[in-house]
Amino acid sequence: MSADPSSSTSRTVAVIGAGPVGCLAAMAFAKRGWRVEIYEGRADLRLPESRANLALRSINLAISHRGIVALQAVNSAAADRFLADAIPMHGRMVHTTAGKEETIYYDRDHQHINSIDRAVLNQGLLDELFFRHKVQNIDFDGKKMTARDLETGRDVEAHFDLCIGADGSYSVVRRQMMRVMRMDFQQTYMKDEYMELRMPSGVGASGESTFLLHPNRLHIWPRHSFMLIALPNKDKTFTCTLFAPSTEFDKLDTVDKFLSWFEHHFPDAHRHIGADALAKDYSRNPRCPLICTTSNPYHYKDRAIILGDAAHAMVPFYGQGLNCGLEDVRVLSALLQAEGITSDKTSEDPTIVDPRLAHALAYYSEHRHEDLVAICDLAQNNYVEMRHDVTSPMFLFKKAVDNVLYMLSRRQRLSLASFGSALASVPFPAGEPSEWIPLYTMVTFRPDVSYATAQRKARRQARVLTVLGWLTASAVGAGSLLALVASYDRARRLLTR
């Protein structure tokens, strides 16, 4: 991936972690002329056995506008390839215990998120890596590190100008940074866990493979304290994920108990998956923890920075973990460009700090932190919406009102294509849209609106909805949509006094 591996005048970036975030970071720096080396402790993720192991505990990835724009900013051709392998999902399909299905669209314009297999995304980004090399120690001040070749057991030393930690929730790079700097860090395990299940494809009238559920929906079986979700795959199967409190899983300590419980709560999913397949998945697939981590700052001098889950692991209920991590890369790359940071070495002496690069990394830490805290909070809150609120008439009513106000106040529809070029060189979009925009639309389909801005705006809009509900109930009992819309300006004036 290096522009010129033999050149001694180009800076070297060592990327630790070969997941989507690490690989996109490597591509971004290679594009800017840096020498790139990627270190990954796992075996080659493109091998069949690696993909099989990944499938046992890997939630399918939902990539939306933020992630796509980040990919486009680095390599538009790669973004097009990934989208060709993705399946669009235009909304949630809610499954009741009575077998009824109802679609709740994400957006009044039927904009969609995309389901993509994690292995497919990784495979498309991987190129030149040191697989089976586990980082043992990092000397940031000396700009060198030791990695163990797990095949031979030998330690190898590598030198770098910048180290990027994209090595996940249990980041080695983050732990090494905490030895030499003051970093605030918090790790929280959720009371819930998850287990992967798989729904097979069906057989059509002519013997062809078919989807057993609507292929362009994210399927949800909300059951208040737990839920099942299913995302479509290109081979006509569905990757299902069961989320439940640890105490609920503890009760299901035999296959028979699990099958009986599953059939009672998810009868249609039980029918589609089948008892034998469910029993196999229950026995083979692990119960996995849900973890949330926060840290600050994200950098050390001019020589280290953490991105993605290494900096901010979040629960998967907003579908923004991948998108946020990829956006980290876009923001950092655009910031380095804006600061005029090039691939040219500034000194051969590792003790000398490059003030411009140090300032750029510090600026990233300071200005990215608010957004990362916001999306972690939003993701956690969205779990309640997915497993409980989507069954509530009040939720559906508020969503309808949200969309009406969005329609009435919107000035123009912004397409995905319009964001790519606009954000490629803008690390932190400024300002706040003046029109009414639902929270989900801002987070998922408006990469020009920061997470923190979306959260602040949504809180104000929620207060407006509360006042509208009160005014409508007072005026017309159950209320009519026209009366509610007519109350909009009055409610907004009340809130801004």
Where would I find each of the regions flagged by the language model?
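Conserved mid-domain beta->alpha element of the FAD-binding
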Residues: 15-27, 31, 197, 286-381, ...
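Glycine-rich FAD pyrophosphate-binding loop
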Residues: 30-55
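Generic enzyme active-site microenvironment
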Residues: 38-39, 165-166, 307
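Conserved FAD-binding catalytic core of PHBH/FMO-like flavoproteins
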Residues: 137, 142-290, 294-300
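C-terminal helical "tail/cap" subdomain of flavin- and related membrane-associated enzymes
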Residues: 334-497
